Amino acid sequence: MMKKNKPTVAQTLSPEEEQAKFFEEAKNNVMIQGHHMKLSLDNSKLMDALKYASNIINELRTSLLSPKSYYALYLVAFDYLQYLNTYLYEEKHGKKMIELYEVVQHAGNVLPRLYLLITVGSVYIKTKQAPAKDVLKDLIEMCRGVQHPTRGLFLRHYLSEVTKDKLPDIDSSVENGTVMDSIDFIIQNFTETNKLWVRMQHQAPTKDRERRENERLELRLLVGKNLSRLAQLDGVDQKTYSEVVLPKVVEQIINCKDKIAQQYLMEILIQVFPDEFHLATLDIILQTCAQLQSGVDVKTIIASLIDRLANFATRNADLVPDNIKIFDIFFNNVKEIIQARPNMELQDILGLHVSLLNLTLKCYPTNKDNANEVLGLCQSIIVNKAKEDINKPTCVKQIIQLLQIPLDVFKNVLVVLKLSNYQPLISCLSYNNRKKVSLDIVNNTINNSTIIEEPEAVNNLLETIQTLIKDEQDQPDMDDIDKEDFQEEQNKVASLIHLFDSEDPEKLFKIYIIARGHFGKGGPHRIRHTLVPLVFCSLRFIRNFKQQVDSGVISLDENKWIAIGSKIFTFVSETIKALADIKLADLSFRLYLQALQTFDHCGLVSRVKELAIKALLIFQEDIADFKAQVMALQLLISTLNSLSIPNEEIYESLAAQTIKQASRLLLPQDQAKLISTCSHLFWVDNPSRQYQNPDSVLQALKKALSIISNESSPGLGTFVDILNECLFYCDKETDAVPIQFVSDLVELIRTTHVKEADPALPYLQNTIKYIQSQNYKGISI
């Protein structure tokens, strides 16, 4: 029975594995041939060595390797050829270079022939056995024999590498060649290298186009090094660059019509040549940008150039000629480029404007018109773009950057707001982004303590940050807004009021009126934050104004002072009323009392009565919580007691109304305590005013005692409170409170209201101790 053979399955290699296999085979062959070449050279067998060198180069004739693998193989071969180069230069072979130069031209295949020719030719030049210009011209012409994109590209790169230190420059003799010969050589090599690099895109099928483009990008340095060689020539000065080098380079860049090549070559051109050269040829470079293919990212190219020249001009202002208007050149050319590219992405357009703005603020920091022009051009472009483009994160980020740059540079919001195109650009943003910019403006103003003295400037600022000040159509529902963030924002807006100041009282009051007009549009959720500091600043204003009048700094007759006081009163009163209208009763009540004290200090008595009545009205109608009522009345009593009202009729009327409100409190204990406290309204003893009405004092205390005595469970504490009020007047040694009244009160407390478990008992005991320590006559303990 015959034995069946097992079927064999052919292994299928992946593309990566196949590349690795091809590369390893070629590399091994190169190393084997290289080993034999070195042995031959060591044994002075030059012709054998050249044969092995030719075999090394034969491996570079392959079409099986990707550009990346081919580059790796080239580097291995390059090392062996350098060994050969060194041997030839040391002249151990005993032959003249002209002989060797002719010998290697008989190599069988064109690629090995040209590599060997370049190797020998570089030594030919170095040993000065032939003029460099003639050998270079011969080599550059010979290289035309290889038109395969990959092989030709690396051949010309080899030519560039081995001749880089042998190029004629400014110190070369005329016979050997001039710098112009080197320029012609490099530009010719650059042109041919670029053509080969561009042609590489056609080597792969259409489906592999993306892969091939990526492979091309990996080889871009082979082309760019030619421009680096040009920049390294000492003989290439600004004149030579602008008249000879640049026109030929940009001609090749434009004519190649390849977006990858154009993108890279423009970037490397800007990188390798000095900034002074770019300054002198700015128009040419920018006009070249306008002629590039539509797929080229001109924004990156121009932005790179702008940033470089802006930094150069900042460091070396004296090296920038007066006749070169950097900003004007960039601005006009950028405008033309944008117009010529209707499909240019908005984010790229905005990126160019960011660079332009940085340029003008670095080079011309005092020229605000340039900055305004940039913002204006940007805004005019944005309004014609679709909203979905404007709201892209990258676009939003750049618009905000455009708005932030002037704030960071000037550190003065007054300067920024003079840019007429600043505010219209903000309006192009969505609500949240407008709010962010507005907050940046507010923070900048606060952090730099920018004092704003002119009404027009205040109006401009508040219009610019209106997103923070009033409701807008595109804002989220208030329920969706974070309450803490909102409160923090409004507090910052409110703090701006303290930066509104002017030595001219008329201007300052006008500023407050403008601020009130803007803040008043904010609705109940905003004005609770913004109007309060405005009230306090207005009260401070009238105090300062009065002080200036009294000291003679401002000359004003009584009638005019009263008229001005009336205006400020109306302003303050209406501002507080706006808060009262949104049910901020406690706050409004306190503000009225604050205003009452201020107008009393300024001697505007009639206004004091009006403010007190307004406060009492809020107390009656809007303060419902009984604890809040007690606190409010205590505050009112303290405020009235501090007044210096010369008109007793007005004062007694206010005191009577206060007692009336106290008698209406919910709890009898509170009624009694507050009415007893009201007794101080009739015994005023302070530096600004002396007023004593003993009858009213006693009447208030008796009324308080009557109220608490009629309670079934009055509590000890209230009686002791009244007793302490009585002792206050005893200490004043006044007959307002008879000693007998106090003695009877003590007896009443001891015999009727003292209970062992009463929490107020220590309070009573301490009071009794005080009475004993004072030795009051007529009070028996």
UniProtKB/Swiss-Prot annotation:
The keyword DNA-binding does not apply. It comes from the Eukaryota. InterPro entries: Vps35 (IPR005378), Vps35_C (IPR042491). It is a peripheral membrane protein. Its main location: membrane. It holds the Pfam family Vps35. GO terms for cellular component: cytosol; endosome membrane; late endosome; pathogen-containing vacuole; retromer complex; retromer, cargo-selective complex. One of its GO terms (biological process) is protein retention in Golgi apparatus. Keywords: Endosome, Membrane, Protein transport, Transport. It is found in: Membrane; Endosome membrane. PANTHER family: VACUOLAR PROTEIN SORTING-ASSOCIATED PROTEIN 35, VACUOLAR SORTING PROTEIN 35. Belongs to the VPS35 family. Plays a role in vesicular protein sorting. Component of the membrane-associated retromer complex which is essential in endosome-to-Golgi retrograde transport. The vps29-vps26-vps35 subcomplex may be involved in cargo selection. Component of a retromer subcomplex consisting of vps29, vps26 and vps35. This is Vacuolar protein sorting-associated protein 35. It comes from Dictyostelium discoideum. The lineage of its organism: Eukaryota, Amoebozoa, Evosea, Eumycetozoa, Dictyostelia.
